[in-house]
Amino acid sequence: SPTLSEIRALADALQISVSELTRLPVPAPANGETDSTKEAVRLALMAVNHGYPGGVVLPVETLRARVTAMVGALCRCEGEREVGAALPALIQDLHTSIAAGRDVAELLKLSAWLHTQATVPWLRLAGDSLDLREQAIMLAGQAAGEHGTPAPIGLVAAAGASVALEVGAFDLAQAGLDVVTMPTNTPETMQLAGFLALRRSTVAAADRRSGDVDAPLEYAAELAARTGEGNAYGLSFGPTNVGQFRVHGLVEIGDYERAVSIAEGLNPDAQDRARQAYYWIDYGLALARLRERHDDAVRAFRRAEAISPHRVLRDPIVRDVLAVLLRHSRRGSPADHELRDMARRAGLPV
C-alpha cells in the first residue's frame, strides 16, 4: 500500500497531480445519494463565495445547536447520509446570518468550527476531489481571520494541513502549522494544542523528516496526560489519540512491526467512533505490510467498515491495499471470503 510520500513521489514521476492518482471510479462505491449531496454542498459553497448564500437568518442559539449536532453525529458515525443532506442548508443559513450582522463574532467561530469539523470531514468521507475541501478551508480561514482568536485559527491550521497532506503539499501543510501558537490555559485549547502537535508529527512523517516526528508527539503526550481522554471541538484528543497518531506516523515511515505492536496496546473504544474507525484502518494498513498478518489486516478493515463503510470503501489508500490483499489471498479461507465481499462493496474487480 502506498504511503502519502510514495503517492507524492509517483505523481511527480508521472507529472500528474496527486488527486489524479487517488480519484474514485465512476460510479463511486457505497454511493447511495452521496454524489448528488456533494453537488448540493458544492453549490452551497459556491453561493457563499459569490456573496449570495441564499439561506435564512436564524438566531445564533439555533445555529449553534445545529452545528453541534452535526459535529457530534460525525464523531459518532451516526446518520452520515443525513448529515450530508443537512449540510448545504446549514452552510447557507449560517453565512446568511453572518451577512445580516447580528452576533457576528459568535457566528464567525461557528463558521470556522462547522467547516473544519463538519464540512471538510464529511467531504473526505464522501471521497470528493479535494477542491471542495479547499473551498471549505478558505471559508473557515476567512472566518477565523476575522474573529482573530487562537482556537478558530488553530482549527483551520489543523484541517488545512490535513487537506494539504492529501495533495502532497507537505511544505504548505507545515507552513500553515508553523504560524499558529496555541495557548494551553483552558482544557479546550490544551486539547487543540495537542492535536496541532499531532498534526505536525504527521506532516513530518509524510515528508520523511524522521528527525522531526518524535518531538511533537512527546509534547502531545505531555498534554494528553493532563487532559485525559477528551473531545473538545470534536477532536477526540487524549492519550489514545496520541498513540494512534504514533501508529499512523510509523506506517508512513515504514516501521510496520512497531506500528502493529503499539496499535495492539491501544484501546480504541476510549475514543469516539470516527477515531475508532481510523484506528482499525491504520492498524490494518500496518498489518497488510506483514505477509503473515494479511488475514488480520482483512479483519481490521472489516471492523472499520462495520463502524463507517465510507471511510473504508471510498478511501483511495485502503482501496489500493484491498486490491493488493486480493492478489495474495488464499482462496477459500474465512478471511478470503470477507475480503472478496468487501472488495465487491468497494467496486473492485474480484
Q: What label would you give each PLM region?
A:
Residues S1-P2, P27:
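Recognition helix of helix-turn-helix/homeodomain-like DNA-binding domains
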Residues K38, V60-R64, D336:
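Onset of an N-terminal alpha helix
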Residues R66-V350:
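Conserved binding/catalytic microenvironments
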